[in-house]
Amino acid sequence: MKKISLLGATGSIGTSVLEVVRKFSDQYRIVAMAAGRNIDLFARQIEEFSPDLVSVLDEEYAHCLQERLGGFRGKILWGNAGNEEVAAYPSASITISAIVGAAGLLPTLAAIEAGKDIGLANKETLVMAGKIVMERARRKGVALLPVDSEHSAIFQALHAGKRADLAKIILTASGGPFHGRTAAELAQVTPAQALAHPNWSMGRKVSIDSATLMNKGLEVIEAKWLFDVEPENIEVVVHPQSIVHSLVEYHDGSLIAQLGVADMCIPIAYALSYPNRLPLGHKRLSLTDCACLDFIRPDTENFPALPLAFEALRRGGVAPAALNAANEIAVAAFLDGKIRFLDIARLVTDTVDVVSPGDENKLDDILAADRESREITRQKITELF
């Protein structure tokens, strides 16, 4: 029986993790769970999976949860400290890091320090502090198993050859709901339109990132650290069908790809069962139903978030952390109707250009850049809009 700590239980990834655990309850048990504000759903999850420890956003939500649960015999915590305790829960052998955003960094580090293998869905952990995270994981001897469909695809394709023979990795992007739109059209899009992803069911923040291509930019940075490749050896192509989840190219010209339906339970199950595979029984890909597979160069002029991420990666230091923080604030402002779609990338650019320099080897510098970037972006929104 593999015991699991789950961070971000009520989100899109978290609910999919629980779907897999529910199906294979003879092999997996949830022993600790953390969530944010969705107390109704979290209470139902706790009643079903009976964890020993849970954590929520703050003390007020903890009291609400206690009232909802009544006879719950486990421990209820809250805040960052609660998330970190869930992440490092002693009896868990793997921690699934599925909190959205920078909030996932410190709990993931806590899990690593506690010697837990990590099922990594929180890409911001490596975007912000990739060097620190990878060094600590190596020191502790823990496995970082990708849960993102693209990074899971690369992880699987890398088993087909030797790392010394790797030429490049190719990340596929759906292109989001606005693929092919002009700048004039993008200037008019609404949050509701941006949230309507054509292929995947995702949370609100990730859906907007997919629409701007920032999600793919963050995945580029994640891939650099996870697979130890340089930016010039990472390529992004738009693949509207979302069937080829990513590819690896070797020096002999071979391209190894992982294909499948758009179902997050597949990479989640692989991370939980690695190196084995689980018979999910979900819908499978029928190759004869694939009329065509398109691969297109990204439109980096109308979707500048992708080259912004590459540039932040090349700059190094705290630039990726600043990029991520500014984007989180800008996306929230767009969802609240305070700024327009095209303003997101502009705000990120302006913030990254002025944030104080810092050392990527120092966690305090990274966290300081995160705080400063958020404040700068908020000020710009207040002043300009």
Curated annotation (Swiss-Prot):
SUPFAM superfamilies: 1-deoxy-D-xylulose-5-phosphate reductoisomerase, C-terminal domain, Glyceraldehyde-3-phosphate dehydrogenase-like, C-terminal domain, NAD(P)-binding Rossmann-fold domains
One GO process term, biological-process aspect: isopentenyl diphosphate biosynthetic process, methylerythritol 4-phosphate pathway involved in terpenoid biosynthetic process
Needed co-factor(s): Mg(2+); Mn(2+)
Binding positions (NADPH): T10, G11, S12, I13, G36, R37, N38, N122, E124, G203
Alphabetic keyword roster: Isoprene biosynthesis, Manganese, Metal-binding, NADP, Oxidoreductase
Enzyme Commission number(s): 1.1.1.267
Coiled coil: none
Top enzyme class: oxidoreductase
Residues the entry annotates as binding 1-deoxy-D-xylulose 5-phosphate: K123, S149, E150, S174, H197, S210, N215, K216, E219
Reaction equation(s) it catalyzes: 2-C-methyl-D-erythritol 4-phosphate + NADP(+) = 1-deoxy-D-xylulose 5-phosphate + NADPH + H(+)
Annotated pathway: Isoprenoid biosynthesis; isopentenyl diphosphate biosynthesis via DXP pathway; isopentenyl diphosphate from 1-deoxy-D-xylulose 5-phosphate: step 1/6
Entries under InterPro entries matching the protein: DXP_reductoisomerase, DXP_reductoisomerase_C, DXP_reductoisomerase_N, DXPR_C, DXPR_C_sf, NAD(P)-bd_dom_sf
Function: Catalyzes the NADPH-dependent rearrangement and reduction of 1-deoxy-D-xylulose-5-phosphate (DXP) to 2-C-methyl-D-erythritol 4-phosphate (MEP).
Protein name according to UniProt: 1-deoxy-D-xylulose 5-phosphate reductoisomerase
